[in-house]
């Protein structure tokens, strides 16, 4: 059975996206993202796919899967499926997969996930109407939180690793 992991970066107020992108720059988070997802399928929604810079779309070294309800949607270099169930059945031989966004896909995958990798960026963002918010982890999740670190961009961040208890 394929292990389902979720990975995201969020502000201290739970914002993971704003205006079609991430509202901060923390290169160390991208390094961690690459370390955890490299060699594994990454599953994302169409808007997350569209938000990836053209130069790294599809994400290299990973099987890229885009979920879309739009029947004729095509994503060059990626596979497109209409549901998470269809995706998982096509990944049954894979040891693990990572869900990389967005909000709707996290919500669908959260009940199936057994691990989460979260980068918390020490920035306070008031919620705006179109913000994308991080999933809320309930008390079935147990986490380990690292110390605050300072990014080369000057922002403080810390890493959280969660698994189902």
Curated annotation (Swiss-Prot):
NADP(+) binds at residues 8-9, 16-21, 45-48, 67-70, 100-105. Substrate binds at residues 7-9, 29, 62, 119. Residues 3-165 form the DHFR domain. Keywords: NADP, One-carbon metabolism, Oxidoreductase. GO terms for cellular component: cytosol. Its EC number is 1.5.1.3. Pathway: Cofactor biosynthesis; tetrahydrofolate biosynthesis; 5,6,7,8-tetrahydrofolate from 7,8-dihydrofolate: step 1/1. Transmembrane segments: none annotated. GO terms for molecular function: dihydrofolate reductase activity; NADP binding. Pfam families: DHFR_1. GO terms for biological process: dihydrofolate metabolic process; folic acid metabolic process; one-carbon metabolic process; tetrahydrofolate biosynthetic process. It catalyses: (6S)-5,6,7,8-tetrahydrofolate + NADP(+) = 7,8-dihydrofolate + NADPH + H(+). It comes from the Bacteria. It is an enzyme of class 1 (oxidoreductase). PANTHER family: DIHYDROFOLATE REDUCTASE (PTHR48069:SF3). Key enzyme in folate metabolism. Catalyzes an essential reaction for de novo glycine and purine synthesis, and for DNA precursor synthesis. Belongs to the dihydrofolate reductase family. This is Dihydrofolate reductase. It comes from Mycobacterium leprae (strain TN).
């Amino acid at each position: 059975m394929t292990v389902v992991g979720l990975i995201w970066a969020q502000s201290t107020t739970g914002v993971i996206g704003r205006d079609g992108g991430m509202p901060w720059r923390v290169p160390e988070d991208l390094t961690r993202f690459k370390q955890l997802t490299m060699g594994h399928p990454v599953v994302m929604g169409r808007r997350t796919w569209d938000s990836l810079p053209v130069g790294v779309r599809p994400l290299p070294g990973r099987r890229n899967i885009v979920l879309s309800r739009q029947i004729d949607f095509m994503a060059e270099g990626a596979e497109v499926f209409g549901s998470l169930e269809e995706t998982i059945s096509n990944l049954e031989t894979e040891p693990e997969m990572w869900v990389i966004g967005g909000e709707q896909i996290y919500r669908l995958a959260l009940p199936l996930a057994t691990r989460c990798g979260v980068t918390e960026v020490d920035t306070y963002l008031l919620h705006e109407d179109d913000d994308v918010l991080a999933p809320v982890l309930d008390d079935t999740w147990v986490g380990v939180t690292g110390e605050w670190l300072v990014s080369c961009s000057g922002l403080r961040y810390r890493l959280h690793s969660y698994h189902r208890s």
